[in-house]
Amino acid sequence: MTTTEQSPAAATGPDAPRRRGRRPLAAAAGLLSAGVALGAGELVAGLIGPQSSPVVAVGDTVITLVPEPVKAFAIATFGESDKIALVVGTLVVIALYAAVLGVLALRRRTAGVVGITLFGVVGAAAAATGPAGGPLDALPALAGALAGVVALLALMAPLTVPTAGAAQTRSDDDGAPLAERLRASLGAGDRKGAGLDRRRFFLTSAAAAGAAVATGGAGRLLLRRFDVGGARADLALPAPASPAAALPAGADLAERIDGLTPLFTPNREFYRVDTAITVPQIRPADYELSLTGMFGSPRSYTLDDLLGRSDVIERDITLTCVSNTVGGRLAGTARWLGIPLGAFLRENGIRSGSDQLVCRSVDGMTIGAPTRSALEVEDAMLAFGMNGEPLPVEHGFPVRMVIPGLYGYVSACKWLTGIEASTYDAFDAYWTERDWAAQAPIRIASRIDTPAPLRRFPAGRRAIAGVAWAQTRGIGAVEVRVDDGPWLPAQLSPQVDADLWRQWVLPHDFAPGSYQLTVRATSAEGEVQTEERAEPFPAGSSGLHSIRVNAT
């Protein structure tokens, strides 16, 4: 038998104390309604595509709209987990919003319905107008909003059950037309004389939670059919016509120095900085690279067209993100496989008036690369292989651009589907629109890997070691300073290629005490790394990496 509780406050007159007592349950109802909405949205997104997910769409919009200092702070604070932090932050905001709507709906259900509908419209607009969006991508958010409204009304009903004193009024209302009863239901809220049906509320809550989990889980399962991991694993890469230079024996100092960065970065550890909340999935059979703009004529290439070329090259190249701070880890080296970019552009009749290549990703991202670098940098390439395997999906599968000597935001377009030969006057790419420098050659950089900052270690002889890079120029020397002493020359790993970073090591005898260690590099052309500090925005960081350590 269902029991209905009447708040003592109802007997004494004022409704506020009774309403305050139900606010936690109303907030929970709002949260559960949001869960149902998100679950339904994910279910429909599973039928359409990952880009249509309401959370992803809103997150993409946030990335587009937030100021650059906020993005820089997120990357510096969360590193490669910045997207996870964004999704978590989005969900927290949704949860707070939903809880407030639940409390408002306790007084007037229309407020909750309007609030959920508004959020659905915002999500639908974000999905439909996103770089890779379309009208169909609005459906998950709209379906989620509808499910959320139904869930909210169902959850609010047990919180405002008419008591015996109000039963006659409700009985009289039953004879009213349907439209009037619906309006009354939406506007009713916490009416005078209403009670609380706890059992019904908890049963409805359990059903809502189950629906949210079931639909959300089903949506995740459906999204797996878009995964291209299997197709990537089956892709056969061609042998290079021009292999990478052979590495001399003992080239990787990390094999004998603990804590030193390896010469090559494993794919799973290679840094990833981009704006894609969900990694784009392109099936090899569907891939097409379009050339437009200032070429002899427009043309498209399939992946087989690129893989079947006779001029495939293999090169060892270090990439660096412009967001890398002094001493940061947003740099990595891989053995890349692809076709020479300069020859490819000339073959397609690129015109002399073009000074910018507008590179387009499948997710709508645009990267502006200087045409001159693409043509003149010897090892610039369209890459489809990384460290002996097809490009990882996270790093641009099936094709990306690699131009040594330039920060990634003006060269390393991932999931590349279009190249437009254009000019800087005619088009501002994504980052240029946000006031980053239009052209940004990588600055000379060096880093201390070991000992770690603030590390305590036994006094005695110990290796100070790290890496340094100056792509296209090469590293000619690395020096280390202990406290305010003289600059001491470090030993360098063999120079394999000017585009590849060099490891360095300096054995040093430490007496007990605290020490400040500083490193600087000199390019093979004789340019000394600047001591002037600069933040990553707008053209890359500069300054010397310095740490404090303690010998005991």
Please state what every model-predicted region is.
Residues M1-P24, T163-K192, T552:
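Actinobacteria-biased recognition of intrinsically disordered, low-complexity terminal regions
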Residues M1-T110:
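Membrane-anchoring hydrophobic segments
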Residues L38-E42, A98, G123, V213, ...:
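Helical transmembrane-bundle signal
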Residues L43, L47, S52, A95-L96, ...:
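Structured, non-membrane catalytic/scaffold regions adjacent to prosthetic-group chemistry
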Residues D82-A179:
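Membrane-embedded alpha-helical segments of integral membrane proteins
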Residues L178, L182, A212-F226, W501:
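Hydrophobic multi-pass inner-membrane translocation pores used for secretion
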Residues A188-A209:
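N-terminal secretory signal peptides and thylakoid transit peptides that target proteins
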